[in-house]
Amino acid sequence: NDYLNKKYNEAVFCNISTTEYFERKDGKNYSFQDFTSNPHEYKSKIRNYIYDTDMLITGHYWEPKFPKLFYPNQINEFKNLKIIGDITCDINGSIPTTIRSTSIAKPYYSIDINSMKEIDLGNKGIAVMAVDNLPSELPNESSEEFGDSIMSEVLPYLINKDDGRINRATTASKGKFYPKYKYLEDFIK
């Protein structure tokens, strides 16, 4: 993984899956199905990625049975970490800096990495964005444009004869994936 092995002078990003940030405690191979069935057998290895990271944005599904991504006693290791965007907004969940939710009007707060308590903005600490309804936020203009596009570009072809666009956009029918989407079956097993 280049993100772990190279040094950069420009901004870069890394999008990782659970296979890259969780591992079995006993060293056996990772399996997503096993991970979801036996999360207690796994531990996080995301610290390898966060060590040189300036900004961490998480959007993973989490519930208390799953391991946390990192713990308060590890946060001092992340010398460059300045901002955490916790899209999941699980208070006291997988991200220990998410101690409360924020709002669109006031989207972030600062947290002291030693006490793990909220501090005044502008003080040394980590900025945390944890807007609990962020995944459902959609600007009015985008919503209107999306609705207009559905009305003009989709609905007529659902009601009348399809010119091929509906067929091309369909991933499954009658409980079966279309051939070009068969690879998705691996994600639901």
Language model region names:
Residues 41, 51, 70-73, 141, ...:
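Conserved active-site and cofactor/substrate-binding residues in soluble primary-metabolism enzymes
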Residues 1, 65-68, 93-94:
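Short glycine/serine/threonine-rich phosphate/pyrophosphate-binding segments
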Residues 1-52:
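Glycine-rich phosphate/diphosphate-binding loop of Rossmann-like nucleotide-binding domains
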Residues 11-13, 54-56, 82-84, 125-129:
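Structural motif
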Residues 61-62, 88-89:
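Short glycine-/small-residue-rich Rossmann-like dinucleotide-binding loops
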Residues 45-58, 65-82:
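Rossmann-fold NAD(P) dinucleotide-binding segment
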Residues 35, 59-61, 139:
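Glycine- and other small-residue-rich loops at beta-strand/loop junctions that grip anionic moieties
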Residues 83, 89-189:
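Adenosine-phosphate binding glycine-rich loop
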